[in-house]
Amino acid sequence: MQQSSSVGLCRSVISVLVATALYSPMISASTVDYGETVDGVVLVNDIQTVYGTTNNTKITATGEQHVKKYGVSNNTEINGGYQYIESEGEVNNSTLNDGYQIVQVEGAANQTTINNGVLQVYGAANEAVIKGGSLIVENGGIAVFAVIEKGGLLEIKDQGYAIAVNQKAGSAIKATTRAAEVEGVNSLGQFSIKDGVANNVLLENGGSLLVEENDFAYDTTVDNGGVLKVMDGGTAIGIDKKVGGVLTISTNVLEVSGKNSKGEFSIKNGESINYELDNGSMLIVQPQTKASYTIVDEYASMQNLGSDTGTTVMKYAVYNLGRADIDGQTQYSYDASSEGMKILGGQVNVWAGTMSNVTVSDAAGVLQIMTPLDNSAAPVLTGTTNVLNRASLYVHESADTINATVNLDYSNLVLFSASQISAYTQFMFSELNMRNSDVIMRDDFFSRTGVASGTEHYINLAVNTLAGSGNFYMRTDMANHQSDQLNVTGQATGDFKIFVTDTGASPAAGDSLTLVTTGGGDAVFTLGNNGGVVDIGTYEYTLLDNGNHSWSLAENRAQVTPSTTAVLNMAAAQPLVFDAELDTVRERLGSIKGINYDTAMWSSAINTRNNVTTDAGAAFEQTLTGLTLGIDSRFSREESSTIRGLFFGYSHSDVGFDRGGKGNIDSYTLGAYAGWEHQNGAYIDGVVKVDRFANTVHGKMSNGATAFGDYDSDGAGAHIEGGFRWGEDQWNIRPYLAFTGFTTDGQDYTLSNGMRADVGNTRILRAEAGTAVSYHMNLQNSIALEPWLKAAVRQEYADSNQVKVNDDGKFDNDVAGTHGVYQAGIRSSFTPTLSGHLSVSYGNGAGVESPWNTQAGVVWTF
C-alpha cells in the first residue's frame, strides 16, 4: 500500500518541470538577490526569481514568481499567474484569487488564503484557509491545520498527508483509502483515513471517497453532491446515504451495508438482497454474482453482468442487462440473466444475456431488446412479457424472441429493422395477444456505431398465434413489390386494423401486394387509414380479403389520390389566370368605343373567384387578385379610328383543393392590343399576351402528410372580337362575336412524396357571342355616368388537356362545354381627364362557376 519516497520525489520533480515548461514563457525576467528586500512589485509579463525577500508582490495572469532556496515571499497576491515555492523556499500570508501556487518538495506555504485557483502541494502547506478553489496534496505532500470553508475543496492524492483538518459545513474532501494519513474534524466529529481504513468521513458538495480493493470505510456519510465508490474487494460498513449523494458499488465487494432514504441495505458474499437504490446510486452486478429483489429508484442505475431476480425499475431509472461501464471500459456478459423484473416507468436495455418473465407499465416504461454484437450470441427475451398501460417494448433486429409470449394491453410493440444483407428482417414470437395496442414496424434509429440505416429494410413478423384487438403500422413499396408483412402460422382471432404509409410512387397497373396471412381463425383485418384507403401513386388502394386467410392491398381505379388531384388542379387553374387578366384589357377596349382622346394611361385591379370541377376529377376553389397597367393612343382617320396599346400586370392566385391542400400561382403578364372602329359603329379588337407562371403545390395525402412541389411554366394567347355599336340618344347597344386561344408549355415535375407529373399543353379554344348595353348620363360639373350591362355565352372546344401522373394515370383535364357570363358595371368621368370604372360579373357552366369577378380602375387621358 506504501510507495517509496524516491518514486514520490521523481514524480514531484517531473511535475514541476512540466509545469515550468508549459507556463513559463515570459517577455522579461528580474531577480531578487540574497540579502535584498523588494516591496510592492507588480508582475506583468515578468518572471521574478527570489533569493532574498519580497513583500506585497502582486502576480497578474501573465506573471510568475519563483521562490528559490532560502528565499522568502510575504503577503503575495496571486491574480491568475504562478507562484513556485522551490526546495527550502518559504511564502507567508499569500492570497490566491486565481491561478496557481505550487509548493515543491521541502518548500513551504504558510497561512495561504485560497479564494479561487489551485494550491498544489508536494512539500508543506500550513494553516491554509480554503474559501474557494482547491488545495491538492500530492504524493508525499502534507497539509497541516487546513480549514475548508463552504465551497472549498481539499483533495488528498495517494500517499498524501492532511493533518488536523477542519472541514466546515458545505465544504468538500476528496480522497482515496490509499492516502498516507488524513485526520481532522467535521460536523459529525473526528474523521480519519490511515493504513487503508477510513472512519467517519463526510462527503458533500463535490467531495468523494474511493475505497480500494482490500481497504475499508466505516460510518461514511454521503450527503448531497458527495460520491462514495467502493471497488471490487472493498468494504464499506455503516454508510449513511443521503438524498442527492451518489453511491457506486458492485456485487464483487467484500461487504457494503448501511442505510439510505429507502431503509437498510446490505451486499455481501457476492449477493445483494433487498437493496433499494435511491437517487444517484449505482449497482454493478458482477459475473457469477447475484442481486435479489433490488429496487432501482428514480435517477438510480443498475448494470447486470451476473444474475438478478425480482428487480423493480422505477420511473427515470436505468437498467442494463449484459453490459456494464466500469472505469471507462465497457464489458459484456452473455451469461447475464434477469428473472421476474417489473419495469414501472424506467428504461431497461437488454444488450446480452436472457430476460425472462418481465412486466412493463407506465407511459415512460421501456423494455428494449438490442441488436447483438457482431458474431455474438443474441440477447434473449423468453417467457411471458406483459406490456401495460401505454408502456413500450422495443425489439431490434436479430434479437431472440422466438419463445416469448407478448401480451400488449393499451401499449406498444416497436420492431426495428436495419439489415445490411437482406431486404427483409425476420421477427418471431411464440404468441402475440393484444388489447387496444399498436405494433409498429420501422427502420432502426439506433446502431452500435451511432449511425442509422440509410435505406428502407422491411420486416416479416411471424407469430404462432394472434389474438385480441389493435393496430399494425406497416410500410409498403408497391412499385418494387416490397412491404412489411404479418404472418400468423397458426390461429388468428380478433379485430385488427392495418395502417399503411402513403406514397406518391405508383406500381404497375393492377398490382396487388399481400400484407397479412394466417393459418386460420376468424380474425378480421381492415385498412385503418382515413376513409379505409391509402394513397399509392396515382390511385387509392384498399385492403382486400382474398378469402383464403390472406389480405392484400388492391387498387381502386374509381378514385384517384388527393396528390393526383393536386396536380390536376394546378394545371386546370392556369387558363383561368390568363382569362381573368385578359378581361381587364377587354373591358378597357369596350369602354372607349365612340370616345375621342389622344393618349391615356389606365389601371385595373381585379378580384376573381372560380369554383372548378374538371372531367378528370380536379376540384378546387381559386381566388385571384391582380393589377393591370396599360397605355394606349387613339389615331383618327377620315371615316374611322384606330387604337394601339401596351399593358403589363401581375396576379396571385390562392388555389384551395377540395380533397385537402392548396396551391399558389404567381403570374407575370405582358401584352399588346389594337382596335379599329368605323364611324358607322363597326369595330374589331385584338389582344395578344404572354404569361410567366410560378406554381407552388402543397397537396395533402390521405394520411394528412404534405406532398410539396413547385415548377414554372409559360403561356401565350390571343383574343379577337368583332361587332357593331348602335347609338341612339344616350343609349348604346353592342352585339359582338369573339374568339380566344391560349396554350401553356408542357412541364414535368416531381412531388416530395415521389409522384411524377407530366403536364401537357393546357389550352383554351373558345368562341363567344354576347351583347352589351349602356346608358350615358351627363351630370353637373362635367361629371358623367355610364351604367352598363353585358351578357354572353361561351363555348369551350379544347377537350384534350392531358396530364400524366406516374406511369399509370393519363387524364383529359379540361372544362369543355357551354358557359354563361353576366356582367354589370358603371363608368364615371370625374374631370375632363380623369375617369374611373367599376364592374362585377357572374359566370357558370362547363365545370366552372365564377361567383364574382370584380374590377375597379382609373383612366387618365392627356
Annotated model-derived regions:
Residues 557-733, 840-841, 846-853, 859:
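Outer membrane beta-barrel translocator domains of Type V secretion systems
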Residues 506-523, 617-635, 757-762:
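Short secondary-structure subsegments characteristic of cysteine-rich extracellular domains
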Residues 22-72, 180-210, 254-280, 284, ...:
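N-terminal segments that cap or nucleate solenoid repeat domains
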Residues 42, 74, 92-93, 181-186, ...:
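Extracellular beta-solenoid/beta-roll
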Residues 743, 756-862:
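Outer membrane beta-barrel transmembrane domains
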Residues 568-570, 615-623, 658-666, 694-712, ...:
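Solvent-exposed, glycine/polar-rich loop segments of beta-barrel outer-membrane systems
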